[in-house]
Amino acid sequence: MSKMYYAENPDAAHDIHELRVELLGEKMTFLTDAGVFSKKMIDFGSQLLLKCLEVNQGETVLDVGCGYGPLGLSLAKAYGVQATMVDINNRALDLARQNAERNKVEATIFQSNIYEQVEGTFDHVISNPPIRAGKQVVHEIIEKSKDFLETGGDLTIVIQKKQGAPSAKSKMEDVFGNCEILKKDKGYYILRSVKE
């Protein structure tokens, strides 16, 4: 039994909210619920990550730990990317599917414990990783992302300094041989590594 957002089937009592927000210049609505990450607002880290991403129409994006969908869905709506969105949390995935429909966005959304069910390669892997699931999960998102990136593709994550940004940065440098801090704001770091 778990109420945590990184559980497969959170058992928290339902508490549906509707968020009306503007992301990347697009007006969007999102259903959220108890047992999912950041249910009352689009968290600051996700908003910062979106502002720092450089993506183009038709490119492929893998959103790891997508939650109810704000990252992948807003990128698909604003830029016409092909979004693939995965999460372990079935409640979050149900919401992400409903949110895709509500916002008239096409996306591929399915359950996967990190990359377990993912196939193929992508131009971009993005993540606002589930810090509370532990450093091991964050490091696995970083380490294995390389296997799912095209050459020249990139991994971009958001992480707070106090929640391990320096160690995430050094892990990204170990894996990719490079890591750029795209932005620092209010203790949040946007980190990007390119597969060379």
Give names to the regions the model predicted:
Residues 54, 150, 177:
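Short conserved AdoMet
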Residues 152-159:
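Conserved beta-strand signature within the Rossmann-like core of class I S-adenosyl-L-methionine
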Residues 160-177:
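Conserved class I S-adenosyl-L-methionine
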Residues 184-196:
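Core SAM-dependent methyltransferase catalytic element
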Residues 1-24, 34-39, 187:
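N-terminal auxiliary segments of SAM/dcSAM-dependent transferases
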Residues 139-151:
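A short glycine-rich, Lys/Arg-flanked "PGG" loop and its adjoining helix->strand segment in the class I
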Residues 44-127:
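Conserved SAM/SAH cofactor-binding pocket of Class I
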Residues 75, 144-145, 172:
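Class I S-adenosylmethionine-dependent transferase superfamily signal
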